[in-house]
UniProtKB/Swiss-Prot annotation:
The organism's taxonomic lineage, starting at the top: Bacteria, Bacillati, Actinomycetota, Actinomycetes, Mycobacteriales
InterPro entries with a match to the protein in the record: PS_Dcarbxylase, PSD-A
UniProt cross-references to PANTHER family, sorted A to Z: ARCHAETIDYLSERINE DECARBOXYLASE PROENZYME-RELATED
Protein name, per record: Phosphatidylserine decarboxylase proenzyme
Active site feature: 206 (schiff-base intermediate with substrate)
GO cellular component, one term: plasma membrane
Function comment: Catalyzes the formation of phosphatidylethanolamine (PtdEtn) from phosphatidylserine (PtdSer).
Broadest EC class assigned to this enzyme: lyase
UniProt record similarity statement: Belongs to the phosphatidylserine decarboxylase family. PSD-A subfamily.
EC number: 4.1.1.65
Keyword Manganese among UniProt keywords: no
Amino acid sequence: MARKPTPPGTPQPTSVGHIVDLVRGAVPPLHPAGLPFVLAPLGVAVLGRNRKWVRRGALTSAAACAAFFRHPHRVPPNRVGVAVAPADGEVALVDSAVPPSELDMGTEPLPRVSIFLSVLDVHVQRSPVGGEVTKVVHRSGQFLSADLADASEVNERNSMLLHTAEGHDVAVIQIAGLLARRIVCDAKVGDTLPIGDTYGLIRFGSRVDTYFPAGTTLLAERGQRTIGAETVIAQLP
């Protein structure tokens, strides 16, 4: 992301302040859910500072966790009626399927886009459309590999239903995986989410399914890489 130009007359920052500003602009912020995973190894590094292998191992672990829980700024497209990717990752499925029963969206298959997140991807989830949260349902289940077709049905999941201003219902499903054993969803019924707004996170590898209303044109392709909040994956009817 390009840095904003400095307006004329702006006081010049000190060398230390300038370095801090550059670091803030270059390093993505950390999602709050990742703080314990970063602080714990940092504490180990401090306690074991006299042992080089302990210090290095702990600092490496802290850096890896900070990278995993990064929360980069994103700019959604300013286009009417589009849906954006709810996560970074690779499109695993572009098809039609029956939405999770707990959302009461009926038994007819609806257009669906599934995105698989590897451990190297950004793992925050973002709202694919702007709308009001009308349902949030967590369901316990198994922890199969998230890239398997059955994962959407049998794995632990958190389902959220959004109702847009145009009257469309869009469902986003956070699905746990082989390593992802913790789903975080900060959205609550009654909340209004702007398109691209961060609402949750899945720890360490996962999958996100998005169900759209009938008549939606799916624009994503299997194998495509997506950028959460920015890649357009569908055009609503």
